């Protein structure tokens, strides 16, 4: 017994030493394995002071831990380098620059806002490093970045779901409530366009910022209520939403008959710690769209383990209560990065980290992970109903464009469970349906000066003073633009003259009386302070019109003097060259010198009309004439076209009264333009109608008329052929319709005007009311043809003439070659003999008298005579 007791401590000591040795060996081997592993550095830039930042950080860390527990044999390890951006895009940018330069990170996770995503994407493009953005809004401005990966909501699918939801309840008129920030405005543009394409009328659109006061919220909501709006689509963050809904409840807008729909981006920004009991109570009955992540065993287990890893103070303080969709995306993104890092380290793989991420395929917590056009999109949405302090799921919006619910319980909406609306009613609000509530009356002020009836004509009953006729180009455009919105229009005559700035102020100050104004109203900056203008529906700018002046010498103007002289010289040169070629054999080119000169000139100029009667016998002369006739054809054709243009629109010449300029009486626009240095005049003459314009120009009371283009088009249309638009300047903004400040009709009508313009209907209206084609201007007149423009033509002709002369010279030399050779030989032999004699006498001088060959010959002759 004693022996056993003695041996037991020894045995235990031995076992402890053995275990210690084994553990050290295992640890050392593990450390050796860790040293052999390749570290891939990844930057994680988040707002660590926000709930989303904390969720994403913890989710990424836990995801990497799980990944390498499951893949312990991998040779790579992601090393997270976390930086706090404090919610500031510039701090995030600075952090990423530091990570790239000092740490050499190979990927970046960050960029939750639109601006932050753009900044980080720019760096990613230059450094060729993938940037993964979580929950940043979809935007066309981000599509150009090839190294940016987005995990976000599918905005297109969501907008289709909201539109189908509205149509299901027969709501075709809504108000949009959004946050005045780039992130929220950007994603709202697609929604507005989709609503318009699907006949959902956006009655009003209001924007709030985080700095908006409660009074501002109340005032804007009260305006919406006064408009009769009952259906609202809300797209803003929880910071504003928690203040908006209590204000709406105070105004009675969270009761029966109202409907509020929250977008998925708004719903994903809600966290329990920001929503107090008052806000939860006010939001009862609100319907929201949320990106749907199907619950799975893996997601459930991960969420439970994730909550256990959170600090105690965050769990007990209810700061973080659930894993957000950004946290789920962060988990899957971390797995794809870890998998891609391992793939790129394989010796047989040449893919970059970005390419490996794009090719990643696995089943993650959010479902099947697969990038589509550099995006990980959530295109299925669950529809929740805010009840009490929580949410109740009432159905799903599927990517195939249909609604469904798990219980298959029917409600007032197909395939959705029963919704409890604001006020506690299960009966769906009727909304502001124009088909049910009838046509809304639109009270429109119309200008009634009747100075240009083709633009605007208003007639009233002399007894009742009620408007009996409203017509004109402006009215037709307005009626075509407002027709899609099914308004009953009530026209009200404006009786205070042509001061349309006062008209704008009246529309602004008397909102209870007027909704819009129509007429020949120019868009100006001072008027836009009071009202909202539509797009211009007329041409923009001023024009100058003057009377045409006929010229008796217009036929000289198509060609410049240099071209006239050069053409005449080539006509004569053609005759000379043909005469040189034909005169030896052709009798028609022979005769006395006066006759031959006449033939040369006649033949050259007769080619102008192809009327030369002389028959050519030499092919060389035919070649010369063919080339020149081609040149003449081009000259004549160009001359005819230019002369036609000049006779259609002749240059004008102002009359002697250069100090008189006509303009529309009372037009502030024309008066302001005439003070410009380019249109300055000594004296102005105010005119009232198009008839006054025409009479003043015809009797030369004014030199020209300066007015806006629509007025001048009417003048030219009523007096075709008498006047000419000399010049135009884009110094005005054209005519537009005026609406109340903030009215949604202004952008909607602008969109209809754009459609009228692109469909050519607007041009048809102009032709019908102005009764003419587009006016000719001096800009339409062709410039005279210069010699420089035809230098190539004359170069070709000159080279052809030179070639013909060269051939003629060669033929002449060949015919007279023997005679020329003999003459040359005789000439050179005589010169050689004289040279030899001169050379001989220079070397051996002769006796006196003998050095003169003439003297020598004389002596010899004398001797012969003696014999």
From Swiss-Prot:
Biological-process GO terms, alphabetical: calcium ion transport; calcium-mediated signaling; cellular response to amino acid stimulus
Subunit record text: May form heteromers.
UniProt keywords (A-Z) are: Glycoprotein, Ion channel, Ion transport, Ligand-gated ion channel, Membrane, Receptor, Signal, Transmembrane, Transmembrane helix, Transport
**Principal subcellular localization:** membrane
Q: Which domain of life is it from?
A: Eukaryota
Residue spans crossing the bilayer = 561-581, 591-611, 623-643, 793-813
GO molecular function terms noted in the UniProt entry:
calcium channel activity; glutamate receptor activity; ligand-gated monoatomic ion channel activity
Its annotated function is as follows: Glutamate-gated receptor that probably acts as a non-selective cation channel. May be involved in light-signal transduction and calcium homeostasis via the regulation of calcium influx into cells.
Name assigned to this protein? Glutamate receptor 1.2
Please tell me whether the keyword DNA repair is annotated for this protein: no
């Amino acid at each position: 017994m004693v022996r056993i007791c003695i041996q037991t401590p020894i045995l235990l000591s031995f076992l402890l030493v053995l275990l210690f040795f084994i553990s050290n060996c295992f640890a050392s081997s593990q450390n050796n394995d860790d040293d052999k592993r390749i570290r891939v550095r990844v930057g994680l830039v988040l707002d660590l002071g926000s709930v989303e930042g904390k969720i994403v950080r913890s989710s990424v860390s836990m995801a990497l831990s799980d990944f390498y527990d499951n893949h312990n044999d991998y040779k790579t390890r992601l090393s997270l380098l976390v930086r706090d951006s404090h919610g500031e895009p510039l701090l995030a940018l600075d952090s990423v620059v530091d990570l790239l330069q000092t740490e050499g990170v190979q990927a970046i996770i960050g960029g939750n806002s639109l601006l932050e995503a753009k900044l980080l994407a720019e760096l990613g493009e230059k450094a060729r490093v993938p940037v993964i953005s979580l929950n940043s809004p979809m935007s066309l401005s981000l599509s150009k970045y090839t190294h940016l990966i987005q995990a976000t909501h599918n905005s297109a699918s969501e907008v289709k779901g909201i539109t189908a939801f509205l149509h299901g309840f027969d709501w075709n008129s809504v108000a949009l409530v959004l946050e005045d920030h780039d992130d929220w405005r950007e994603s709202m543009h697609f929604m507005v366009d989709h609503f318009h394409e699907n006949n959902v009328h956006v009655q009003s659109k209001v924007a709030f910022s985080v700095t908006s006061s409660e009074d501002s919220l109340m005032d804007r909501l009260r305006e919406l209520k006064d408009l009769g709006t009952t259906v609202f689509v809300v797209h803003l963050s929880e910071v504003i939403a928690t203040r908006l809904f209590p204000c709406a409840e105070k105004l009675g807008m969270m009761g029966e008959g109202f409907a509020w729909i929250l977008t998925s981006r708004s719903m994903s920004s809600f966290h329990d710690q920001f929503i107090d009991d008052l806000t939860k109570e006010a939001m009862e009955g609100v319907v929201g769209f949320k990106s749907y992540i199907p619950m799975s065993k893996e997601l459930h287990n991960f969420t439970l383990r994730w909550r256990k890893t959170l600090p105690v103070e965050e769990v007990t303080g209810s700061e973080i209560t659930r894993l957000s969709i950004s946290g789920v995306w962060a988990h899957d993104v971390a797995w794809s990065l870890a998998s891609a890092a391992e793939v790129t380290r394989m010796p047989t793989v040449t893919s970059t980290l970005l390419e490996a991420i794009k090719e990643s395929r696995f089943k993650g917590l959010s479902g099947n992970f697969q990038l589509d056009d550099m995006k990980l999109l959530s295109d299925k949405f669950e529809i929740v109903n805010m009840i009490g302090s929580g949410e109740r799921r009432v159905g799903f919006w599927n990517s195939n464009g249909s609604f469904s619910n798990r219980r298959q319980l029917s409600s007032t909406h197909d395939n959705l469970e029963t919704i409890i609306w604001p006020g506690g009613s299960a009966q769906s609000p009727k909304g502001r349906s124009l088909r049910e509530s009838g046509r809304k009356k639109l009270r429109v002020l119309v200008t009634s000066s009747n100075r240009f009836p083709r633009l605007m004509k208003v007639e009233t009953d002399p007894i009742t003073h009620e408007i009996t006729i409203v017509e004109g180009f402006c009215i037709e455009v307005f009626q075509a633009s407002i027709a899609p919105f099914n308004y009953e229009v009530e026209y009200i005559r404006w009786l205070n003259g042509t001061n349309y700035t006062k008209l704008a102020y009246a529309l602004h100050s008397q909102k209870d009386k007027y909704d819009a104004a129509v007429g020949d109203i120019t868009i100006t900056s001072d008027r836009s302070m009071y009202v909202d203008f539509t797009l211009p529906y007329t041409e923009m700018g001023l024009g100058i019109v003057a009377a045409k002046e006929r010229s008796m010498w217009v036929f000289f103007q198509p060609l410049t003097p240099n071209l006239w002289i050069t053409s005449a010289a080539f006509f004569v040169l053609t005759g000379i060259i043909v005469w040189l070629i034909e005169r030896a054999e052709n009798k028609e080119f022979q005769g006395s010198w006066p006759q031959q000169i006449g033939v040369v000139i006649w033949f050259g100029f007769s080619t102008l009309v192809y009327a030369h009667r002389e028959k050519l016998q030499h092919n060389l002369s035919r070649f010369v004439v063919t080339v020149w006739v081609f040149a003449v054809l081009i000259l004549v054709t160009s001359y005819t076209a230019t002369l036609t243009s000049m006779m259609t629109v002749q240059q004008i010449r102002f009359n002697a009264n250069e100090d008189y300029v006509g303009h529309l009486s009372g037009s502030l626009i024309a008066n302001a333009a005439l003070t410009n240095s380019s249109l300055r005049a000594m004296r102005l003459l105010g005119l009232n109608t198009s008839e006054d314009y025409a009479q003043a120009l015809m009797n030369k009371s004014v030199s020209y008329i300066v007015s806006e283009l629509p007025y001048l088009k009417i003048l030219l249309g009523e007096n075709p052929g008498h006047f000419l638009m000399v010049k135009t300047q884009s110094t005005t903004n054209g005519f537009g319709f005026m609406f109340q400040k903030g009215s949604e009709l202004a952008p909607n009508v602008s969109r209809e005007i754009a459609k009228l313009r692109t469909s050519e209907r607007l041009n048809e209206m102009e032709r019908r009311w102005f009764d003419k084609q587009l006016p000719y201007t001096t800009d339409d007149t062709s410039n005279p043809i210069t010699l420089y423009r035809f230098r190539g033509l004359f170069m070709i002709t000159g080279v052809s003439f030179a070639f013909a002369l060269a051939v003629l010279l060669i033929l002449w030399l060949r015919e007279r070659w023997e005679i020329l050779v003999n003459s040359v030989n005789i000439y050179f032999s005589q010169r050689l003999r004289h040279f030899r004699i001169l050379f001989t006498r220079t070397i051996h001088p002769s006796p006196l008298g003998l050095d003169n060959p003439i003297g020598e010959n004389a002596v010899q002759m004398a001797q012969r005579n003696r014999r």
